[in-house]
């Protein structure tokens, strides 16, 4: 596409770097990307470490009626201290409860940076603003119990889809600061249980209270025991609700 043709549509604030993890700790950390897909459709992903070449990545499906306790096959990538791991690819179209999630070894210190939309398409992901184009459960449980994660990536989408960020950071008890969000239109259960059990979280993004959708903020900060206040927007005026 000619950039001139759609330059007015691109959010200039979107990071053009693919989603990536940086090991800032002093020990190796295993990281893998796994899918939960009832229809067993294999998404296509690539990864690279530091300035290396992009390599194909096998995403195993954890949904299997033969193995009700979870995935029996794994594809971990060893991330050494000071190394950076990049991911990009094409997410499967979702018409049911299917999603991708990371498995991360405990006991490390991992920063996440870049544009999370590189998990939706491998190129020009920085044009994405409407998550409805990628189905429901877009980033559902993406960092499920990734206890080595110490921060959250910026969330660029303007228009959310149902359950898109539901349980996204559940159990990520290393995160202290909430991500910057750019939401203009909510969806049902979009932020449901998003930070549940993030007991080190100390702040929240500014949350809109106009045009709410069913369960959009339901238990968003449940058991966030370090949180003292939640920042809400009423008629374009910032307000605070104490814990």
Predicted segments with their positions:
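Solvent-exposed serine/threonine-rich low-complexity stretches and specific carbohydrate-binding patches
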Residues: 52-68
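Structural signature of tandem-repeat unit edges
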Residues: 1, 9-10, 14, 19-21, ...
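Noncatalytic modules at the cell exterior or secretory-pathway interfaces
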Residues: 29-31, 75-92
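Short beta-strand segments and strand-loop junctions that repeat across beta-rich extracellular domains
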Residues: 42-56
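Non-cytosolic beta-sheet module surface loops
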Residues: 23, 33-40, 89-91, 156, ...
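Register-specific detector for alpha-helical tandem repeat solenoids, activating on a conserved position
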Residues: 140, 166, 192-193, 218-219
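A short beta-strand element within beta-rich, extracytoplasmic domains
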Residues: 16-40, 84, 123-130
């Amino acid at each position: 596409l000619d950039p001139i043709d759609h330059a007015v549509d691109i959010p200039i604030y979107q990071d053009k770097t693919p989603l990536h993890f940086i090991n800032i700790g002093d020990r190796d950390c295993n990281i893998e990307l796994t899918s939960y897909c009832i229809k067993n459709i294999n998404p296509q992903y690539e990864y690279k470490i530091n300035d290396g070449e992009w390599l194909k990545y096998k995403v195993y499906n954890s949904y299997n009626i033969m193995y009700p306790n979870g995935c029996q096959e794994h594809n971990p990538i060893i991330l050494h201290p000071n190394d950076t791991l990049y991911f990009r690819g094409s997410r499967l179209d979702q018409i049911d409860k299917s999603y991708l999630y990371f498995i991360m070894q405990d006991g490390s210190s991992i920063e996440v940076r870049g544009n999370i939309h590189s998990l939706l398409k491998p190129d020009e992901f920085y044009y994405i603003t409407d998550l409805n184009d990628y189905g429901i459960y877009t980033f559902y449980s993406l960092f499920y119990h990734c206890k080595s994660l110490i921060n959250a990536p910026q969330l660029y989408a303007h228009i959310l889809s149902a359950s898109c960020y539901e349980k996204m950071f559940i159990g990520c008890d290393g995160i202290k600061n909430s991500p910057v969000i750019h939401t203009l239109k909510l969806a049902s259960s979009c932020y449901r249980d998003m930070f549940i059990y993030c007991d080190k979280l100390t702040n929240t993004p500014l949350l809109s209270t106009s045009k709410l959708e069913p369960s959009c903020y339901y238990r968003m900060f449940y058991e966030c025991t370090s949180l003292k206040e939640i920042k809400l927007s009423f008629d374009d005026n910032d307000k605070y609700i104490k814990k």
